[in-house]
Amino acid sequence: MKIYMAPLEGVTGYVFRNAFEEYYGKGRIDKYFIPFISPNKSKGYTTREQADIAPEHNAGINVVPQIMANDEGLFLEAAAMLKELGYSEINLNLGCPSGTVVSKYRGAGFLAKPRELDIFLDKVLSSPQMKDMRMSVKTRTGMESHEEFKLLMAIYGDYPLSEIIIHPRVRTDYYKNSPDMDIFRWAVGESGVPISYNGDIFKIKDYEKLVEEFPDIDSVMIGRGFVGNQRLINQIADLSIDNTDNGQNHDKVDFTHDDTLDKHDMETLEKFTGRLLKDYIGIMDSEVNAMHKMKEVWIYINQFNPGHEKAFKKIKKSRNLTDYQNGVREFFDGRKI
C-alpha cells in the first residue's frame, strides 16, 4: 500500500517536508501533497505559495501540488504554471471545511454545487492544457450528509481521474466525529478509479485496522498522525516487512508499547525539531516568528506524548527563543532513557 503525506495548511510546507524526509520518510513516503495554492484574478500567488511549489525546494522527494479553485479558467492557468515548473500531477481540493473557503464554494463548499462541479471537471479534463497531466481529487463525502456522496461519486466516475482520495467526513463534521467507514466501504466497491483513504490514522493500530478491513485500496494519506507521531512511518515500514515475508525472516513486530518513545526515538525527534527551528529561522524575518511556527508543530507532538504537561506548558507560553529552548530541553531531558 502506498503512503502519502496529507497537505496541512501552515504546517507541512517545504521546510517541514524536507526535514521529515531526512529523519523519517527516507524514501518511504510515496507522495507528499503540497498545501493548496489558490489562484485568483488579481493578487497572483503569495510568497508562501511560490516558495512551496518551487522545484528547488522539493528536490529529491515526490510532491504533488494541490489547487483550490471552482473556476476552470483559473484552475487551468495554475495547472499550466505548474506544468512549466515540471509537475505532471495535480490535485483538486474538495475537502477544506474552513468557513471562509466554503462560503465561496471552494474546497468542501464546491460539493454543495454538484452540477457546477460536473461542468468544471468536464471543462478542465477535456482541455488541451491538461495533456500529459494527471489529476486527482481529495474529497469529503458531502456538505451535510453522506447521502450526497452517491451523486458525487457518479460524477467523479465520468472522468479520467488518476485517483480519488476520500476523507469520509462531511463538511459539517470539520474534524469532529469519526470517519464514516460505511460510506467509504461503499465507495471502494463502486469506484473504478484507485481509491486512497484519509482520516484519523494516528497510531499503528489505526493503520493495521484499515489494512485489515480494506486490503485492496491503493493508498493511505496521513496528515496529523505524521506531524505529531513521526515514527508512525517506521512502524508502518516494519509492519510491511513483517507481512511481506510472513514473519519468517523478521522478528515479530511488537507494538504493545507504541505510545512510549525510546531513546532512539527521542534523539531523532530532537534532531528533527532542531532542524525545523534552524530552517525556519533561516527563512523567516525573526526568531520569534520561527518560534511561533514551531509551537504549531509542538501542539501535534503534545497530543501523542501525554504526561509531560509542564514542558509543553513552557513551550506554549514561551515569549522568546530562550524560553522556548528551555521548554524543549526540559521535554527531551525528562524523556531520554
Task: Identify what each model region corresponds to.
Residues 3-6, 32-34, 63-67, 90, ...:
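Hydrophobic faces of well-ordered beta-strands that scaffold small-molecule active sites
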